[in-house]
């Protein structure tokens, strides 16, 4: 049977063994996951016996124009294969990532010594998601923010081209590559950075990144903060130092005065004659005058007596043993 799988296999083996007459250069096709792609085929052969499509080394579809027979080798491809407009161009739908590869088509005719072939290379790509942007090490010196932005895809898609757009300047700039070096000084007009990721079937944009937000730490530059801190601390420390020095001299002067005063007091105690009383330090008490009547002496009524100390003293011990009795004292020459 002309359309049996055994016959198709024999035709494919015969084609591989005998070689083929190439009709043209390799054609590259691009498709997206879930989409469709058409392998164009234009044949100049008037009488076509069969057309065989293969994927890598596996027969995919065989067409027999005379009987209008289309044989799909694998059942899973029956709903995916189509030949639009009644031609021989192959349309493959519901593309998968593993559909990427090399496709051949061979046109067999009794009028040709070798089959006419055409080679295709199919690349199936996924639609790109939003690219991710990461920031490298940031340096803030003198209010200038210097860092690198890196754009990448989370799933590592193939054949992705990255481009950066810098918006906000007089002329918008573009930068090719996944890494964008930036330098932005605090106080300048704000800038917006956007990463654009492209592949042959799609493109996507990152979220906009504001330089002011990215470099908000530049205003808090450690060096600038340190300078400001020094400018504030130096006068304060200098004032504290001067105050401490003044208090130290004052304390020292008071200690010296105290030592001198103590020495003077000690000298005055040892030699009182050397330290005459100073009028400045003398204090006087004022005694109020009281009216007192001074009695005049009356010689006629005055009694005078002469008291002589006894020549013999009593023994002190005997005085202790004597009872408390009044003693009679002898007075001589009482006038």
Curated annotation (Swiss-Prot):
Residues 131-206 form the Ig-like C2-type domain. GO terms for molecular function: identical protein binding. Its main location: membrane. Disulfide bonds join 145-215, 151-195. This is SLAM family member 7. The chain crosses the membrane at residues 227-247. Proposed to be involved in systemic lupus erythematosus (SLE) disease process. Keywords: Adaptive immunity, Disulfide bond, Glycoprotein, Immunity, Immunoglobulin domain, Innate immunity, Membrane, Receptor, Signal, Transmembrane, Transmembrane helix. Self-ligand receptor of the signaling lymphocytic activation molecule (SLAM) family. SLAM receptors triggered by homo- or heterotypic cell-cell interactions are modulating the activation and differentiation of a wide variety of immune cells and thus are involved in the regulation and interconnection of both innate and adaptive immune response. Activities are controlled by presence or absence of small cytoplasmic adapter proteins, SH2D1A/SAP and/or SH2D1B/EAT-2. Isoform 1 mediates NK cell activation through a SH2D1A-independent extracellular signal-regulated ERK-mediated pathway. It comes from Homo sapiens (Human). A motif (ITSM) lies at residues 302-307. Coiled coil: none annotated. Residues 23-226 are extracellular. It is a single-pass type I membrane protein.
